[in-house]
Amino acid sequence: MSFDVTVTLQIGERRICAEIRSDEKLTALVGPSGAGKTSVLDAIAGLRRPESGRIAVAGETLFDITENIDLAPNRRRAGYVFQDARLFPHKRVDANLSYGKRQADSGASCIPREEIIDLLAIGNLLRRWPTTLSGGETRRVAIARALLSGPRFLLLDEPFSSLDVERAETLSLLIERIRDEFAIPILLVSHTAAEVDRLARKTVRLDGG
């Protein structure tokens, strides 16, 4: 199963219960703002500890409260593309990509760097500073860095946020190719209904509380 997640999270006074069970290559997690979608992604990546539950991705148990399993974030091998991208502003694009490569586990099956650069059409951006990139370019670089880390799975948090129609279309085409060409489960959070309908083979709704 791509994603087998049943967790309870305590965020301040709010209690979030999430269940994601999907065999699909790309699963969408949707819901209103404040429902806790990003918190669920954080829990899957190992950045937030659930109060209870179990997290398994691609057949590997990452967290199980009853079995006392809680893998460290680096052992979970999540390719996490945050909503704000989080590129290193003091490193050129090429160095940001190299950082992703250094994070790859020695035993991980990695997609060749040049293949990723060609796929995401960022060869002309390698000498640029992150602050000079457009929103669409920034997202493409962030996805490339995540893929270079040899991820077990990808977490994409609002990748279409603030993109115009043309850049959103370009990014959609790239995510489609990643979904179809690579054996990497993808969990996508998006408020863009058209993109969810286009990309996701299964949609899970999180209402929060």
Residue spans for each PLM region:
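A short, proline-enriched helix->beta-strand linker immediately N-terminal to the Walker B motif
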Residues: 148-152
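Conserved H-loop
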Residues: 183-189
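Catalytic Walker B motif of ABC-type/P-loop ATPase nucleotide-binding domains
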Residues: 154-158
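Conserved ABC ATPase signature
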Residues: 129-133, 137
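Conserved ABC ATPase "signature" region
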Residues: 60-65, 108-125, 176-177
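Helix N-cap at the start of a conserved alpha-helix in ABC-type nucleotide-binding domains
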Residues: 165-167
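ABC ATPase NBD coupling module
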Residues: 62-79, 103
